[in-house]
């Protein structure tokens, strides 16, 4: 039996109006997520990773325009039947009240800015359950305490009454994960969830998300520039460059048999503890200015293997996995 596709992004195209002109930030994205799968979207800052997933949860800035595309979400309607909805066609109110948090939840990179400093931890976890699940307060409180224990926070009763500033960075990120899980979503989107944490805590948070994924049968999307995170958690990898996905494959094939020169460059820039080289490889040049639509391969100017045709024609998507 084939895996069920729970999220499908088709030909997504997004631009932003700026004082300098129109920035064509997302240029025809296609991406699939299967039930229970972990997919990573990896690329440099500004490649369009976060914008792609913010479109799915209705968090694009007001100057954004969705020019084309679909984001199809498939879920059980409660009667044993699959229902598919295009998230881009929903009103902001419908997306906020029926889907965000309840079916799709997002964990952001900086837990301090994700939490309300004026509200206790407990109230912030309960908020989603009261809004989406319409739970009685006593039941929501009990569930919030259970979630704190699930994400590895000891002395849950005490922490329930704490404010964000009273917790360490690692504990705050655990709270953010608890909030994301409070309405029992199908899909968890993690946007650089460990960037603001030290290396030891990073590993613990990644292990925690994996454990919760298996326990709650979640599908997870990681947005990251950290290939170490990708190697640890991902089943499949989508490599993004200049608003496009340029290579797709499972994690082993991407790491050991990369096809696109940009993917090769990213991997070459990773530190290797087995070599004595003091100098890290860096990809020459800078990403293109998307105020001006790139002609041909957007990576050609930075690619030492580029041919004449690369500056004239856009290459096809590199798919490593069959």
Predicted regions and their residues:
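P-loop NTP-binding/switch modules centered on Walker-like glycine-rich loops
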Residues: 58, 189, 193, 197-279
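Conserved ABC ATPase "signature" region
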Residues: 72, 139-158, 210, 267
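Short catalytic/signature loops enriched in Gly
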Residues: 5, 80-84, 154-157, 250-322
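The feature captures the beta-strand-to-loop junction immediately N-terminal to the Walker
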Residues: 42-44
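A short, proline-enriched helix->beta-strand linker immediately N-terminal to the Walker B motif
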Residues: 182-186
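ABC ATPase NBD Q-loop/coupling interface
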Residues: 17, 70-98, 136, 254
């Amino acid at each position: 039996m084939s895996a069920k596709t729970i999220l499908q992004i088709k030909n997504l195209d997004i631009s932003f109006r700026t004082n300098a002109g129109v920035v064509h930030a997302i240029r025809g994205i296609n991406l699939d997520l299967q039930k229970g799968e972990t997919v990573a979207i990896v690329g440099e800052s500004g490649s369009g990773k976060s914008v792609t997933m913010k479109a799915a949860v209705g968090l694009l800035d007001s100057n954004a325009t969705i020019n084309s595309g679909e984001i199809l979400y498939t879920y059980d309607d409660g009667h044993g039947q699959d229902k598919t909805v295009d998230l881009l066609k929903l009103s902001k109110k419908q997306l906020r009240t029926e889907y965000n948090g309840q079916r799709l939840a997002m964990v952001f990179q900086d837990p301090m800015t994700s939490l309300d400093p004026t509200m206790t931890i407990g109230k912030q976890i309960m908020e989603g359950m009261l809004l989406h699940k319409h739970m009685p307060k006593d039941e929501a409180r009990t569930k919030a305490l259970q979630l704190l224990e699930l994400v590895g926070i000891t002395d849950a009763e005490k922490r329930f009454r704490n404010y964000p500033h009273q917790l360490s960075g690692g504990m705050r990120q655990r709270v953010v994960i608890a909030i994301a899980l409070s309405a029992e979503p199908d899909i968890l989107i993690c946007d650089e969830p460990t960037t603001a944490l030290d290396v030891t805590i990073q590993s613990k948070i990644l292990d925690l998300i994996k454990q919760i994924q298996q326990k709650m049968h979640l599908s997870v999307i990681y947005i990251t520039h950290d290939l170490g995170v990708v190697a640890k958690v991902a089943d499949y990898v989508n490599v993004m460059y200049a608003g496009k996905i340029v290579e797709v494959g499972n994690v082993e094939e991407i790491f050991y048999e990369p096809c696109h020169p940009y993917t090769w460059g990213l991997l070459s820039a990773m530190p290797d503890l087995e070599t004595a080289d003091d100098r890290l490889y860096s990809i020459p040049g800078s990403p293109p200015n998307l105020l001006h639509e790139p002609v041909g391969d957007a990576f050609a100017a930075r690619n030492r293997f580029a041919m004449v045709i690369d500056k004239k024609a856009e290459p096809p998507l590199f798919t490593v996995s069959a």
